[in-house]
Amino acid sequence: MTMKRTISGMIGTGSLAHNRRDFIAENVDPDRVQLNICYRNENLKEVYKELFDEAVERYNVGKRKDRQITNYYEKIRQGKQEKLFHEVIFQIGNREDMAVGTEAGDLAVNVLDEYVKDFQKRNPTLRVFSCYLHQDEATPHLHIDFIPYVTDWKGKGMDTRVSLKQALKSLGFQGGNKHDTELNQWINHEKEVLAETAKQYGIEWEQKGTHEEHLDVYNFKKKERKKEVQELEQEKEHLTAEKEELTAQIAESRADIQNLKDCKSCSC
């Protein structure tokens, strides 16, 4: 019997520590952490060296020292044009119809596991360095973190470089308008691939127009960010109050010093 389920694909925040479970968030079941599947967990800086060190050497040949690139990782990290890496999250169904620990949830795990096996082969210009299937939250889902790059670049800069637009273009995705970017096209394509895999397990993609269901993890992270902002604002207010108090104390001390000087002058 065929079951209908939604398929979600969205850009994640890229919290590598969260994905590795270096800390346990509120929405994570500690008793299920051992069920998570780690497909890849590589050091981001080391992967940057692997991908770009030779290109950096070629670029630096004949360049003045002040124009040479000494650390491409830091150049991208401090720059504004590209991100160090991107994350995409995929999920089938939701907590009501594909909850972890249920028969349907286990089926979702099998589908996601099958889907991710050919991800790197299918997307050679998106170098995956971190990939996890989480089964310790409300619904099974995949976190795939990758570095988009292009080789044999003929434009300005290094011949091998970070570029989401060019990496996706080389995979055949040409952006249209702001609602039809290369990234949106690619995510929709990957959802279709996931849907084909799901079909083999008796799951039909239930499409709900352009409105996609948000992942539980996304809602949690959004809540956490709001909480962090509120805490920072409170800390700012506290520091501002401290600063004002210190300023008043300094002014008072200066006045006392001036009074002492005046008294000393009078006694003379």
Language-model-detected regions and their locations in the chain:
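N-terminal nicking endonuclease/strand-transfer module with a His-rich metal-binding environment
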Residues: 1-268
